[in-house]
Each structure stands twice: as structure tokens, then as C-alpha cells.
Amino acid sequence: MIVVKIGGRVVKNSLDKVILDIANINDKVILVHGGGDIVTDYTKRLGIEPVFVTSPEGIRSRYTTKEELEVYIMAMSLINKTITSKLCSLGKNAIGITGVDGGLLLAERKKRIIVIDERGKKRIIEGGYTGKVKEVRSEVINHLMKLFDIIVVSPLALDVEESTPLNIDGDQAAFAISKAVKVNVLVILSDVEGVLVEGKVVDRLTPEEAKELSKKIGPGMNRKLLMAAESVENGVNKVIIGSGVKDRPVSSALELNGTVIVNG
């Protein structure tokens, strides 16, 4: 079993390549998708101006109000069913779900977050409807995998305390699922060839090397490296960070094109 995570730009620009490639892979697949650019498009169409905040670490992320959460759910559902429809039309036994369904992903809403304001000052604001995954109900995945070959997962989670869906980071969802079911391989596909240092792809890293390198590279990729290291340390065989915009993107990553994080 493998987990594949595709970022929002891959969803927008290279989705058919990914779907066709996954349809030809002879393994069980959990496909976690993003879609931030598409969410932004729909938000603007509905006359809602999207808001982004920057953390003290320099990571820019969507600030999810109650109103925008509704748009997020609609857009992610559209992406999910588009992917699932295409896979089924290619003869694959696929199902599309969110992390809310079956209580697959249980999360805690961020009550307060620290952001950097326009003056460069730290400020504490209300957390909105964004959450952090606290638990993965792996039995949901295991049961569905007895019935289906491919599970397409939208990055939504259930806040049990407040009985509401939450927007969660797609990478976080993919890493959490991978650790919970201890998959063989986690493939992270974005619009870059892998982890770049001085313009060159780093071919291979141990978890320790990944943690060390995370201190020296930009926000976004540093989080991927930290989560990749933690995943390998917790039972995932290997994590591969590669390009989702090339031909055969998943197969290419499985052929170890990109950055491979693995023990030893």
C-alpha cells in the first residue's frame, strides 16, 4: 500500500497525468489531494476575499473563517469527486471520502494562532476553522481497502468537541495517515523536482539528515522534511518528495526520482 499526496498546483495543472499514472499502478493507493488555488478561485467568484496569514516561521497559510470553510468544503468535494470519477472511468475500483467520513481524521481546532502582522510584529488572533490532526482511525482505511483499490481523501477533519469539519493541511493529513497504517511508501508530489539545495536535487536523506537540513531551507519544504523524518522513524518504509508535473509522476517517484528519505 502506498500513499500519494498531490499539492494544489499539481491538482490545477497536472491532474490527468497523475490520475492516469495511478490507474496503471499495481498496488493499493491512498491519494490525498490539496487544492488551495481552486479554493481561492471559488472564494473570489463568490465575492469573498481570501485571507492569508504568515506564521513566525515564515509559513503562509489560509485563514479559514466560517464562511470560507463552507467554500473550502464545496471546492474540495468537487476536486475529490472529479478525481474519483476519472479513476472509476478508467476501470479502477475507487472511492472518494473526506477525513470527516467515518471519523477518519480527528482534529482539534486551533483556538488561537500567532501571526506576523503587516508591521512585522507578532500578534495573537482567533484561530478560525483550521485544525491539527490528533488521531487517525486506521480501521476505517483498513476496512475500505478490503473493498476498494484506491481511496481518494480530501483534507478535512472532524472536530469532535465542536462537531464541525475543519480545514487541515494536506501534507499533515498524508503524513498522519501514512504513519497510522504504516504504508510502504509515501510519495509527496509538488511543482518542484525534490528538495533543492543550491539549485540541485538532494537524492537521499536519512531522518537525521532531513531534520538537520530542515533548519537551512525555506518554509513549506522544511515542514515536509520534518514530517518525512518523523514518518520514517514511525514505521513508514520511505518518503519520496518529487515532481507532480512530469509524465508518469507517481511511477517516476517510485523509481526514486526526487528526494528519498529512508533509514540507513
From Swiss-Prot:
Its EC number is 2.7.2.17, 2.7.2.19. It is found in: Cytoplasm. One of its GO terms (biological process) is arginine biosynthetic process via ornithine. Disulfide bonds: none annotated. InterPro entries: AceGlu_kinase-like_sf, AcgluKinase_fam, Asp/Glu/Uridylate_kinase, LysZ. It catalyses: [amino-group carrier protein]-C-terminal-N-(1,4-dicarboxybutan-1-yl)-L-glutamine + ATP = [amino-group carrier protein]-C-terminal-N-(1-carboxy-5-phosphooxy-5-oxopentan-1-yl)-L-glutamine + ADP; [amino-group carrier protein]-C-terminal-gamma-(L-glutamyl)-L-glutamate + ATP = [amino-group carrier protein]-C-terminal-gamma-(5-phospho-L-glutamyl)-L-glutamate + ADP. GO terms for cellular component: cytoplasm. GO terms for molecular function: acetylglutamate kinase activity; ATP binding; N2-acetyl-L-aminoadipate kinase activity. The record marks K5, K224 as: Transition state stabilizer. Substrate binds at G35, G36, R62, N167. Pathway: Amino-acid biosynthesis; L-lysine biosynthesis via AAA pathway; L-lysine from L-alpha-aminoadipate (Thermus route): step 2/5; Amino-acid biosynthesis; L-arginine biosynthesis. Involved in both the arginine and lysine biosynthetic pathways. Phosphorylates the LysW-bound precursors glutamate (for arginine biosynthesis), respectively alpha-aminoadipate (for lysine biosynthesis). PANTHER family: N-ACETYLGLUTAMATE SYNTHASE (PTHR23342), N-ACETYLGLUTAMATE SYNTHASE, MITOCHONDRIAL (PTHR23342:SF0). Belongs to the acetylglutamate kinase family. LysZ subfamily. This is [LysW]-aminoadipate/[LysW]-glutamate kinase.
